[in-house]
A protein has these predicted regions:
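Short alpha-helix boundary/capping elements
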Residues: 162-167, 224, 233, 293-294
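C-terminal accessory module of base-excision DNA glycosylases/AP lyases that mediates lesion recognition
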Residues: 72-137, 235-297
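Charged, amphipathic alpha-helical segments
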Residues: 11-14, 137-142
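Helix-hairpin-helix/helix-loop-helix acidic hairpins
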Residues: 142-220
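Catalytic DNA-binding helix-loop module of base-excision-repair DNA glycosylases/AP lyases
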Residues: 205-255
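Short runs of predominantly hydrophobic/aromatic residues within well-ordered alpha helices
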Residues: 151-155, 222-225, 282, 286
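Residue-level signal for well-ordered alpha-helical scaffold segments within enzymatic catalytic domains
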Residues: 17, 157-160, 227, 251, ...
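Mixed-charge, low-complexity intrinsically disordered regions
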Residues: 1-71
């Protein structure tokens, strides 16, 4: 369990570890600020746990406090239950892995499925050569979309980009029925394009929309629904669209093995807080964590 200490001047810190200086072999304390950017500091052990004389009073330099008190005013992303990899985050969204190699295996399988079952025209993917091309085309159509138009092609593009794990809606149950799905999907779309900024209220409304869609549409799941939400939010929020919540992000950031809507608002809020702290958009933040996690598996 993490230990927290309050400096005699009032700031709160988390004890990272007690170690030895590699050169002097003296004991040192590594500790992290529980405010602002969460900077990490190092002090000699005896100094950290020593006394200080201020205004004629001798007191502890650092006083141990409980977790509840320590986290009361700390930024959400510094809570120890969340994990953000120690990488050099960039403002630009990286391309999908190996775009020059064509479609990734999962996307290629979805493209083949859609074509084989005649769910899209033979020319549907003409001019699209890799995962990034599909993403750009979906975003292009979303930006030019007018309410009332048929969003079926956009739905299929996002499904294809999401990969083969989204095939269930096409294969299971009574099969794919766009006429039944369309009004439900358009309700989800409206919730997204009505979102002008990220607030606790807008997150709550979007979580409600995700849950409603998840209850009424089988064989898709929260992971793929949030893929659609992320794409449609790009229309109004751009690079700050709320991120996808799939098994990889649930495991990496939330340290959870399962994905469900119960933790979706919490996930979106902590990701938004981290993006703000880094000064980058949510889209590049999610992509970089996702690719880091894939690379370490």
């Amino acid at each position: 369990m993490a230990e927290y200490y309050r400096h005699f001047k009032g700031k709160v810190y988390r004890l990272v570890c007690v170690a030895k200086d590699s050169e002097t072999l003296d004991k040192i304390v590594v500790y992290q600020a529980m405010y602002d950017d969460g900077d990490v500091w190092v002090r000699p052990y005896d100094e950290f746990f020593g006394k200080v004389d201020r205004d004629g009073m001798v007191r502890d330099r650092f006083t141990k406090i409980g977790e509840k008190e320590a986290l009361e005013h700390a930024p959400l992303y510094l809570h120890p239950k969340y994990h953000f990899p120690e990488i050099e985050y960039k403002a630009e969204t990286p391309t999908m892995l190996n775009p020059e190699a064509g479609f990734s295996r999962g996307v290629k399988a979805m493209v083949s499925l859609l074509l084989r079952r005649n769910l899209v025209d033979e020319s549907f993917f003409d001019g699209l050569f890799n995962d990034d091309d599909i993403e750009k085309e979906a975003i292009r159509q979303i930006i030019s979309y007018h309410p009332g138009e048929d969003p079926k092609n956009i739905f299929h593009l996002i499904q294809a980009w999401g990969g083969n794990s989204g095939r269930g809606i096409y294969l299971h149950g009574e099969g794919f029925n766009w006429n039944v799905l369309r009004p439900k999907y358009e309700t989800l779309i409206k919730a997204c394009i009505d979102t002008a900024e990220i607030t606790d209220e807008s997150i709550a409304k979007l979580v409600k929309a995700v849950r409603s869609f998840d209850r009424s549409v089988h064989h898709l799941g929260v992971s793929f629904i949030t893929k659609h939400v992320r794409f449609w939010l790009i229309r109004t929020l751009g690079n700050n669209a709320l991120p996808i919540y799939d098994s990889i992000m649930a495991n990496e950031v939330m340290r959870m093995n399962a994905v469900n809507s119960k933790h979706l608002a919490e996930y979106w809020k902590v990701m938004a807080a981290k993006a703000k702290q880094l000064g980058i958009g949510l889209v590049p933040l999610e992509r970089q964590i996702f690719q880091y996690s894939l690379g370490t598996r």
